[in-house]
Amino acid sequence: MEELQEYLKIEKSWQQDFLYPLFFQEYIYTLAHDHGLNRSILYESAENLGYDNKSSSLIVKRFIDRMYQQNHFIISSNSNSSNQKKFLGHNKNLDLKIISEGFAVIVEIPFSLRLVSSLEGKELVKSCNLRSIHSIFSFLEDKFSHLNYVSDILIPHPIHPEILVQAFRVWVQDVPSLHLLRFFLYEYRNWNSLITPKKSIYTFSKENQRFFLFLYNFYVYKYESMFVFLRKQSSHLRSTSFGALLERTHFYGKREHLVVLFRNDFQSTLCLVKDPFIHYVRYQAKSFLAARGTPLMMNKWKYYLVNFWQSYFYFWSQPGRIHINQLSNYSLDFLGYLSSVRLTFSVVRSQMLENSFLIDIAIKKFDTIVPIIPLLGSLAKAKFCNALGHPISKPVRTASSDFDIIDRFGRICKNLFHYHSGSSKKKSLYRIKYILRLSCARTLARKHKSTVRAFLKRLGSELFEEFFTEEEEVLSLIFPRASSPLRRLYRERVWYLDIIRISDLVNHD
């Protein structure tokens, strides 16, 4: 426990004891609402409510007082639905929205100062390529062929609001700020929806995503920092005797808390060793743990995580929900790709004097393909096709100009091809292009009250040029005529290092 406390210890210089007065500074709300510093939400609200622009601190004080006074409408047992509706509908929650926007900026200050302090005197190589989603797959391409097992992990949710408040006490010791945070967390009962990857975020979280994203990132930070601590400590634990003794050695005492390390009980059987074959990858709330080892070792990691969630976050999870799969027989559904490690066999002829030998060589190869069925489901949900994959028109687009319709459909097609350029089998992507192209033609024909055949005959190749991908445009200039080398080149996987977000059509989890 002492080692864990040292690991999480924060210096006093990083703790901000006086954040609450910043709530009464008008420039905080200017930064929160308008990054261009043209007009702040506080000025706009003051005009609507009849306040003077110069009295920003008084406005915020009245907002905070009114929030605490009106809170009894919700927590009182005698309140009726009309009172709740009155409070929740009060000027679209303007008071709470303004304060929470400023709160999102203020609570980031301790973390920013900590980051600046940790980077002092260090020269870091800035690389924007590491921000790309495709950089994850290039990492997996190098590492996965050497691993044996993978386990899908969903970050547990929901977490109790009081756990977040207690975690904030390590960073912020300003009591009024902690009370205000507790008020926000209990006021917005839908805040847990942000932790769920695909559940909708309700009105407030859409208006002030910065506040909720900060809470979620802080929650993930606490989860992953403890996970890294367990990873570092496990690298120090190994038996110097036989493998059977290793399996009988309990790495951590789980009777009370997972993080209590009984190093003195088996100090003679431990030595310092580093295991580089455990990898952890996360995007949003979905992550996975891959390792090279035995199923028993992966099972230990699984129970470590389950006990950690129970002891630290008070989240009760079932170990059976965390599945351990062998990479050779499993496809990992992650970031819109089905990733797997498959064996490719090749025959090598070896000649020794007068004798020749045929040697079969098995090579592990990282393979990525596009899951066509979920992608078709996303297109059907977006009304580009029906449930069977047949293209349909989009009536909502008929009010736009022909150029805007063609440009929008073309950009969607190019973005999908651009994101899935790392697929080793692009044949399924041509079906997606066919659906989008014919859906565009049906939309234009519906707008002009014509048939698709007549409309395609009138436009000719102009419609199809908008659906050319970047690779097709470049390769068509290099190779004017279709050739076998061109087709082989286009089938190769390409990872782009400029993709920093995932499309809603791709994110079908």
Curated annotation (Swiss-Prot):
A cellular-component GO term for this protein: chloroplast
Domain of life: Eukaryota
Name assigned to this protein: Maturase K
Pfam families in alphabetical order: Intron_maturas2, MatK_N
Annotated family: Belongs to the intron maturase 2 family. MatK subfamily.
Keywords annotated in UniProt: Chloroplast, mRNA processing, Plastid, RNA-binding, tRNA processing
Gene responsible for this protein: matK
Compartments it resides in: Plastid, Chloroplast
GO molecular function, one term: RNA binding
Cited InterPro entries: Domain_X, Maturase_MatK, Maturase_MatK_N
Keyword Coiled coil: no
Organism of derivation: Banksia cuneata (Quairading banksia)
Any GO BP annotation: RNA splicing
Function: Usually encoded in the trnK tRNA gene intron. Probably assists in splicing its own and other chloroplast group II introns.
